[in-house]
């Protein structure tokens, strides 16, 4: 992706970008569907290019990025764990790096507010009754993003409060 200079004459519009269900690490090679980490990166790059085009054409100055969950394939189902081509730690690291790159590139074009929530695929155990709400790989992804952008003036990684009742 070739980044061009930021827009000089920005408007006061806000753009919402929703990110969800990456299931990073999962590999599918069926007659009607193919998905793997390479395809994930291609799709994220395509979304980034489309988003930047929209920012430029609409003179958008504020971008709200919503992470709606299931960024990783995770380990909650044995069948999914076996189909995953990366261990869960690599999934967390690589998704975090992809999100950092995505947000960092968008930040060249406007102010970023990032919000996220926990997905079910990031739980540590299959049975949700055996998990505490705060036992989630999504919290690691959030922490990595928070630490990466802590000193950035135009990126705000918002904290979230986890209700212990989520998933009931």
Over which residues does each language-model region extend?
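Extended recognition/assembly regions associated with phosphoester-bond processing machinery
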Residues: 1-168
């Amino acid at each position: 992706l070739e980044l061009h200079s930021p827009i000089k004459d920005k408007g006061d519009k806000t753009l919402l970008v929703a990110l969800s269900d990456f299931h990073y690490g999962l590999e599918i090679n069926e007659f009607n569907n193919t998905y793997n980490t390479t395809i994930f990166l291609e799709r994220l790059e395509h979304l980034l290019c489309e988003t930047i085009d929209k920012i430029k054409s609409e003179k958008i100055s504020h971008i709200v990025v919503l992470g709606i969950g299931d960024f990783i394939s995770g380990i909650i189902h044995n069948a999914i764990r076996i189909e995953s081509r990366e261990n869960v730690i690599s999934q967390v690291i690589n998704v975090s790096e992809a999100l950092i790159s995505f947000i960092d590139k968008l930040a060249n074009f406007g102010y970023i507010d990032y919000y996220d929530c926990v997905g079910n695929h990031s739980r540590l155990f299959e049975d949700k009754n055996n998990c505490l709400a705060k036992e989630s790989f999504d919290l690691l992804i959030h922490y990595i993003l928070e630490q990466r952008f802590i000193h950035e003036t135009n990126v705000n990684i918002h904290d979230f409060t986890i209700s212990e009742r989520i998933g009931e």
